[in-house]
UniProtKB/Swiss-Prot annotation:
Catalyzes a salvage reaction resulting in the formation of AMP, that is energically less costly than de novo synthesis. It catalyses: AMP + diphosphate = 5-phospho-alpha-D-ribose 1-diphosphate + adenine. PROSITE patterns: PUR_PYR_PR_TRANSFER (PS00103). Its EC number is 2.4.2.7. HAMAP family: Aden_phosphoribosyltr. This is Adenine phosphoribosyltransferase. Keywords: Cytoplasm, Glycosyltransferase, Purine salvage, Transferase. It is found in: Cytoplasm. Homodimer. It is an enzyme of class 2 (transferase). The gene is apt. Pathway: Purine metabolism; AMP biosynthesis via salvage pathway; AMP from adenine: step 1/1.
Protein backbone atom coordinates (compact mmCIF):
# COMPACT_ATOMS: atom_id res chain seq x y z
CA UNK A 1 0.00 0.00 0.00
CA UNK A 2 1.35 3.42 -0.90
CA UNK A 3 1.05 6.57 1.14
CA UNK A 4 -0.90 8.99 -1.03
CA UNK A 5 -2.77 11.67 0.89
CA UNK A 6 -4.13 13.07 -2.39
CA UNK A 7 -5.61 9.65 -3.22
CA UNK A 8 -7.54 9.39 0.02
CA UNK A 9 -10.07 12.06 -0.91
CA UNK A 10 -10.91 14.88 1.45
CA UNK A 11 -13.89 16.31 3.20
CA UNK A 12 -13.80 19.16 0.68
CA UNK A 13 -16.23 18.63 -2.14
CA UNK A 14 -18.29 20.54 -4.64
CA UNK A 15 -17.71 22.61 -7.77
CA UNK A 16 -15.23 25.08 -6.21
CA UNK A 17 -13.06 22.25 -4.95
CA UNK A 18 -13.32 20.23 -8.19
CA UNK A 19 -12.31 23.31 -10.20
CA UNK A 20 -9.01 23.30 -8.32
CA UNK A 21 -8.43 19.69 -9.46
CA UNK A 22 -8.61 20.64 -13.15
CA UNK A 23 -5.26 21.81 -14.46
CA UNK A 24 -4.41 24.14 -17.33
CA UNK A 25 -2.05 22.81 -19.99
CA UNK A 26 -0.74 25.78 -21.98
CA UNK A 27 -0.23 25.44 -25.75
CA UNK A 28 -1.96 22.06 -25.98
CA UNK A 29 -2.95 20.63 -28.40
CA UNK A 30 -1.53 23.59 -30.33
CA UNK A 31 0.01 27.00 -29.58
CA UNK A 32 -2.41 29.53 -28.12
CA UNK A 33 -4.76 26.94 -26.62
CA UNK A 34 -5.11 26.46 -22.86
CA UNK A 35 -6.35 22.89 -22.42
CA UNK A 36 -8.47 22.05 -19.35
CA UNK A 37 -7.18 18.66 -18.17
CA UNK A 38 -9.84 16.85 -16.15
CA UNK A 39 -7.75 13.73 -15.52
CA UNK A 40 -6.54 14.83 -12.04
CA UNK A 41 -10.20 15.00 -10.96
CA UNK A 42 -10.92 11.60 -12.54
CA UNK A 43 -7.89 10.00 -10.87
CA UNK A 44 -9.25 10.54 -7.35
CA UNK A 45 -12.03 8.06 -6.61
CA UNK A 46 -14.02 10.08 -4.07
CA UNK A 47 -13.74 13.29 -6.09
CA UNK A 48 -14.68 11.55 -9.34
CA UNK A 49 -17.66 9.90 -7.63
CA UNK A 50 -18.94 13.16 -6.14
CA UNK A 51 -18.52 15.08 -9.42
CA UNK A 52 -20.29 12.28 -11.28
CA UNK A 53 -23.11 12.32 -8.73
CA UNK A 54 -23.47 16.07 -9.32
CA UNK A 55 -23.63 15.50 -13.10
CA UNK A 56 -26.25 12.77 -12.68
CA UNK A 57 -28.48 14.58 -10.19
CA UNK A 58 -30.58 16.66 -12.64
CA UNK A 59 -31.33 13.58 -14.76
CA UNK A 60 -32.25 11.05 -12.04
CA UNK A 61 -36.01 11.45 -12.54
CA UNK A 62 -35.81 11.81 -16.33
CA UNK A 63 -36.83 8.66 -18.23
CA UNK A 64 -33.85 7.66 -20.39
CA UNK A 65 -33.09 4.81 -22.75
CA UNK A 66 -29.39 5.59 -23.21
CA UNK A 67 -26.53 7.98 -22.72
CA UNK A 68 -24.61 8.97 -25.86
CA UNK A 69 -20.96 9.47 -24.87
CA UNK A 70 -18.68 11.44 -27.18
CA UNK A 71 -15.13 10.18 -27.80
CA UNK A 72 -12.84 10.20 -25.86
CA UNK A 73 -13.37 11.52 -22.33
CA UNK A 74 -17.11 11.62 -22.97
CA UNK A 75 -16.85 7.80 -23.03
CA UNK A 76 -15.58 7.76 -19.47
CA UNK A 77 -18.15 10.21 -18.15
CA UNK A 78 -20.96 8.88 -20.34
CA UNK A 79 -20.48 5.23 -19.41
CA UNK A 80 -20.21 6.09 -15.71
CA UNK A 81 -23.34 8.27 -15.92
CA UNK A 82 -25.22 5.53 -17.77
CA UNK A 83 -24.42 3.12 -14.96
CA UNK A 84 -25.38 5.71 -12.34
CA UNK A 85 -28.68 6.37 -14.15
CA UNK A 86 -29.29 2.66 -14.80
CA UNK A 87 -29.55 3.06 -18.56
CA UNK A 88 -27.70 2.01 -21.71
CA UNK A 89 -24.60 3.57 -23.24
CA UNK A 90 -23.96 4.28 -26.93
CA UNK A 91 -20.56 5.54 -28.13
CA UNK A 92 -20.25 8.48 -30.52
CA UNK A 93 -16.88 7.97 -32.20
CA UNK A 94 -14.38 9.43 -34.59
CA UNK A 95 -14.72 8.07 -38.15
CA UNK A 96 -13.55 4.55 -38.89
CA UNK A 97 -13.69 3.32 -35.29
CA UNK A 98 -17.08 1.57 -35.33
CA UNK A 99 -17.64 -1.69 -37.24
CA UNK A 100 -20.72 -2.07 -39.40
CA UNK A 101 -23.03 0.58 -40.81
CA UNK A 102 -22.76 4.05 -39.33
CA UNK A 103 -24.12 7.54 -39.80
CA UNK A 104 -21.50 10.27 -40.05
CA UNK A 105 -21.83 13.94 -39.20
CA UNK A 106 -19.29 16.59 -40.18
CA UNK A 107 -18.78 19.70 -38.08
CA UNK A 108 -16.66 22.82 -38.19
CA UNK A 109 -13.59 23.41 -36.08
CA UNK A 110 -11.70 26.65 -35.61
CA UNK A 111 -9.54 25.66 -38.59
CA UNK A 112 -11.10 22.96 -40.74
CA UNK A 113 -13.64 20.25 -40.08
CA UNK A 114 -13.96 16.95 -38.25
CA UNK A 115 -16.49 14.11 -38.20
CA UNK A 116 -18.16 11.82 -35.70
CA UNK A 117 -20.24 8.70 -36.21
CA UNK A 118 -22.75 6.38 -34.55
CA UNK A 119 -24.02 2.93 -35.41
CA UNK A 120 -27.16 2.92 -37.51
CA UNK A 121 -29.89 1.26 -35.47
CA UNK A 122 -27.97 1.56 -32.19
CA UNK A 123 -31.29 2.54 -30.62
CA UNK A 124 -34.88 2.37 -31.83
CA UNK A 125 -36.57 5.52 -33.15
CA UNK A 126 -37.95 7.63 -30.35
CA UNK A 127 -35.45 6.37 -27.77
CA UNK A 128 -34.82 9.03 -25.11
CA UNK A 129 -31.15 9.98 -24.90
CA UNK A 130 -28.81 12.21 -22.91
CA UNK A 131 -25.69 13.44 -24.76
CA UNK A 132 -22.54 13.58 -22.60
CA UNK A 133 -19.10 15.08 -23.21
CA UNK A 134 -16.26 16.24 -21.00
CA UNK A 135 -15.95 19.85 -22.18
CA UNK A 136 -18.18 22.35 -23.96
CA UNK A 137 -15.88 24.69 -25.87
CA UNK A 138 -17.16 26.01 -29.20
CA UNK A 139 -20.08 23.58 -29.22
CA UNK A 140 -19.26 21.93 -32.55
CA UNK A 141 -18.93 18.38 -31.27
CA UNK A 142 -22.07 18.54 -29.14
CA UNK A 143 -24.06 20.03 -32.03
CA UNK A 144 -22.80 17.26 -34.32
CA UNK A 145 -23.88 14.61 -31.80
CA UNK A 146 -27.26 16.33 -31.54
CA UNK A 147 -27.51 16.18 -35.34
CA UNK A 148 -26.68 12.46 -35.40
CA UNK A 149 -29.29 11.75 -32.74
CA UNK A 150 -31.86 13.74 -34.73
CA UNK A 151 -30.94 11.83 -37.92
CA UNK A 152 -31.61 8.59 -36.04
CA UNK A 153 -34.95 10.06 -34.87
CA UNK A 154 -33.99 9.84 -31.21
CA UNK A 155 -35.58 12.06 -28.59
CA UNK A 156 -32.84 14.22 -27.10
CA UNK A 157 -33.78 15.02 -23.50
CA UNK A 158 -30.62 17.01 -22.80
CA UNK A 159 -26.87 17.26 -22.73
CA UNK A 160 -24.43 17.23 -19.84
CA UNK A 161 -20.80 18.30 -19.71
CA UNK A 162 -18.36 18.36 -16.83
CA UNK A 163 -16.72 21.64 -17.93
CA UNK A 164 -18.00 24.62 -19.90
CA UNK A 165 -15.51 27.16 -21.27
CA UNK A 166 -17.63 30.32 -21.12
CA UNK A 167 -15.32 32.52 -23.23
CA UNK A 168 -15.79 30.24 -26.27
CA UNK A 169 -19.59 30.72 -26.21
CA UNK A 170 -20.50 27.18 -27.21
CA UNK A 171 -23.79 27.44 -25.34
CA UNK A 172 -24.96 30.25 -27.66
CA UNK A 173 -24.80 27.78 -30.55
CA UNK A 174 -26.80 25.10 -28.73
CA UNK A 175 -30.43 24.13 -29.44
CA UNK A 176 -32.69 26.32 -27.28
CA UNK A 177 -35.24 23.61 -26.64
CA UNK A 178 -32.72 21.02 -25.37
CA UNK A 179 -31.40 21.51 -21.81
CA UNK A 180 -27.61 21.78 -21.58
CA UNK A 181 -26.13 21.47 -18.09
CA UNK A 182 -22.51 22.06 -17.10
CA UNK A 183 -21.16 20.98 -13.72
CA UNK A 184 -18.22 23.42 -13.80
CA UNK A 185 -17.66 26.67 -15.69
CA UNK A 186 -14.43 28.51 -16.43
Amino acid sequence: MTDCSRCAGTNASGPNYWSERIRDIVDFPKPGIVFKDITPLLSDGPDFASALDEMAQPWRTTPLDAVLGIEALGFILGAALARELRTGFVPVRKPGKLPGRTLIREYALEYGTDRIEMHEGALPRGARVLIVDDVLATGGTLRAALGLAAQLELEIVGAAVLVELLALQGRQKWADDVPLLATLSF
